[in-house]
Amino acid sequence: MKINFQKRLLALAIAAVMTLSLAACGQKNGPAASSGSQGAATGSAEVQSGGQEGIVAFTDQAGRQVELEGPAQTVVSCYYVTTYAAIALGVADRVVGLEKKADTRPIYHMAASALLEKPQVGTMKELDVEAVAALAPDLVVMPKKLMDYADTLEELGFQVMVVEPETHEGLVTMLELLGQACGVEDRAAQLTNYYEEQLDRMAQLTEGTERPLVYLAGNSSYLTAAPDAMYQSSLIEGAGGTNVAAGLEGDYWAEVSYESVLAMAPEVVIIPAGAEYTVEDILGDPQLASLPAVQSGAVYAMPSGIEEWDSPIPSGILGTMWLTSVLHEDVYPFADFVADAQDFYQTFYGFQLDGSLITK
């Protein structure tokens, strides 16, 4: 909802006080949702008509009702996933504030450098309510992990959309909702249709093929793995592989021992884009010398200079496609993937991606 000048002043006055109280509240009641949760994706949207012509009303992914006077023209994105989505949906110019550490995201430099000049309002752990209020956005978009801040912002007169794109389905729903909120439904449909079409295409290409045993390691250590409840597990399955860590409990990176990794006996090991270690670290670890993937040299690192394709982001479908080309190059050659990835960025991000950045 757009707020008037008087409400802006009220927001600024209250925000400083609310920031302190909210921080205390968040420590006691912070949500347990994690970035890898495979929770149910909710959310629906519709444009109201009749007596409320032009009103955009929808239910967000936390089951909350959101109502805008019209398509949002100014947006604060508190989450890199939704900032990425704004770029892909062609509304990056409407983002007036975003998450911190924006300069560490290569895609901002490549596709939307103006974002680097925008105010940064918070992290996945805390949000600067006063900074958000000062920007007076039509819409604030935040991950479920920050949902404690939603009520505070609404009390200040702002509309808040909570998202949870932690599954393939949840990501598609998030894109549809953000497209609806910004009045770019056709663009969102184009993006989600591409996503679904490529999932189907990868499934068809790998149908009837052997499904290699895959170990997808975490960012901080290769002695962490993705349980079945994580988005990363669906990436492996969608690429025609079998997640050897699927039986682990939890919805976030699970710590494992050397003995456990050896018992899983993966034929392929995948290192994510944000890893703090290298292929050479794994190949050179004497405690993994008997691992099938190490013995055959089948340890691959996802490209690190573009986006985090192992994450639930608009380009996340490229993670499934990249892995398909690694696991099943006989049916989907790596050169074909490179061409597809370049076409994706040209179509949805508006720039020609340097093919040398696409590695394995």
Walk through the language-model features, giving the residues of each.
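A short, structured surface patch at a secondary-structure boundary
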Residues: 77-135, 139, 145, 244
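Bacterial lipoprotein signal-peptidase II cleavage site
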Residues: 23-42
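Sec-dependent N-terminal signal peptides of Gram-positive bacterial secreted proteins and lipoproteins
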Residues: 2-29
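Extracytoplasmic substrate-binding proteins
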Residues: 54-55, 67, 148-224, 245-247, ...
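Alpha-helical, coiled-coil/dimerization segments enriched in small aliphatic residues
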Residues: 225-253, 257
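Proline-aspartate-enriched helix->loop->beta-strand connector
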Residues: 121-124, 129-142, 158, 257-273
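N-terminal low-complexity, Pro/Thr/Ser-rich intrinsically disordered segments
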Residues: 37-69
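Structural recognition of the beta-strand scaffold that forms the well-ordered cores
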Residues: 76-78, 96-99, 139-143, 160-164, ...
